Regions:
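Alpha-helix boundary/capping residues
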Residues: 20-23, 62
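N-terminal beta1-alpha1 ligand-phosphate binding loop
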Residues: 2-21
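Glycine-rich phosphate- or other oxyanion-binding loops that anchor nucleotides, phosphorylated ligands
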Residues: 2, 27-230
Length: 230
């Protein structure tokens, strides 16, 4: 079985792929890929940036050596309610594309909706999304991965670790994302360097993200061992 694990950023996958084989990719592609064989299964983890276009590139890269039998869309997500806690990992039962209205049902017993948007959601937008969709989490990639899985007729599973709470007051990241879904780090750091009101929240975001990536890795490992063949 070939299992694709699609994320946006290397940091989301770092604890999971420790010890995996790094797969060479075209220079300048913006894609990072790792591979591992386990119990007769081939696992391939890929990230290519934030947003739907980057998720599609990552999915295509995962298929380069052969078609996938199942796919996982994983990574960090923002909280839309206080019911999901930063640093914890959750399995979505439904993915909603806020742009198209499409809904993708997933095989999870606990009801938990995730909504995918085209931009990073700020505090105000988070509350609107929670009210409009009854969702608990927001990301930028899951719907694109779910759509590609549906087209191919393969199962999709969604695991997201919460990086920021519903009330987190973070700087607007959207102006600092390039066309490939990568953060323009130098420009972003220059922006926040003179805005100390964001320093505490960004520090908390970093801690939540690091802890969440570890929890995400443990959740994925457990799923691959116990949940995949149920």
């Amino acid at each position: 079985m070939r299992i694709g694990i699609i994320a946006a950023l290397p940091g989301e996958l770092k604890p999971l792929v420790r010890g995996w084989t790094k797969v060479p990719v075209a220079r300048g592609s913006g894609i990072a890929m790792w591979q591992r064989e386990r119990d007769g299964d081939e696992l391939v983890a890929v990230c290519a940036g934030m947003g739907a276009a980057a998720a599609r590139r990552a999915f295509t890269a995962a298929e380069f050596a052969g078609s996938l039998d199942t796919v996982l869309t994983v990574g960090w997500a923002g909280a839309l309610t206080g019911d999901v806690r930063p640093g914890e990992c959750y399995a979505a039962s439904e993915i909603i594309d806020a742009q198209t209205g499409e809904r993708f049902a997933l095989p999870v017993s606990r009801r938990l909706r995730l909504v995918t948007t085209v931009q990073v959601a700020d505090e105000r937008e988070k509350r609107r999304l929670a009210d409009s969709y009854g969702a608990a989490l927001v990301d930028m990639e899951a719907a694109a991965v779910a759509r590609l899985a549906q087209i191919r007729g393969i199962p999709v599973h969604c695991f997201k670790a919460v990086s920021d709470s519903v009330g987190a007051r973070l700087p607007d990241l959207n102006p600092f994302l390039d066309i490939d879904g990568k953060l323009k780090m130098a420009a972003f750091l220059a922006h926040v360097a003179v805005r100390p009101q964001f320093w505490g929240a960004l520090g908390q975001l970093g801690r939540n993200s690091a802890g969440g990536a570890k929890t995400l890795a443990a959740t994925i490992e457990e799923f691959l061992v116990e949940g995949l063949r149920k």
